A protein has these predicted regions:
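Buried hydrophobic packing segments
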Residues: 44-45, 58, 75, 95
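Mid-chain, well-packed structural core segment of small domains
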Residues: 51-78
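C-terminal structural segments of small proteins and small subunits
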Residues: 71-98
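Residues within well-ordered alpha-helical secondary structure of globular protein domains
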Residues: 22, 44, 78-81
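Acidic, glycine/proline-rich low-complexity segments that act as flexible tails and inter-domain linkers
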Residues: 1-37, 60-64, 90-100
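Short helix-capping/linker segments at secondary-structure and domain boundaries
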Residues: 49-56, 86-90
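Amphipathic, charged-and-aliphatic alpha-helical interface segments
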Residues: 38-52
Length: 100
């Protein structure tokens, strides 16, 4: 299991990490958009911003919510059109061990 990317923040400021977690729960809860759709949007954002680990973690969460590899591929296409080919490279790296 990979190291928690927030381990240092948790050590020096656990309150901010708790705030982040409660915000995450609020933002990604079902509403007008399903949790799955929100996670797919977040995958596209992280791919566009170069966050390989974010793509990986969010894609895993999206899959647990029922996302298919085809849906993930489509959100990476959107990220590519909106942000350039780097989003495909980042998405591919992030999905390396997630999609078989």
């Amino acid at each position: 299991m990979p190291e928690n990317p927030l381990s240092t923040a948790l050590e020096i400021d656990p309150k901010v990490v708790e705030h982040m977690r409660s915000t995450d729960e609020w933002v990604f809860s079902d509403g007008a958009l399903s949790k799955k759709v929100k996670l797919l949007v977040a995958v596209a954002f992280d791919a566009a911003h170069g966050a390989v680990g974010g793509v990986r973690g969010l894609a895993q969460r999206a899959i647990r919510e029922g996302a298919t590899k085809e849906e993930i591929a489509e959100v990476l296409r959107v990220a590519y059109v909106m942000n350039g080919v780097g989003a495909i490279y980042i998405g591919s790296q992030g999905l390396k061990d997630v999609i078989s």
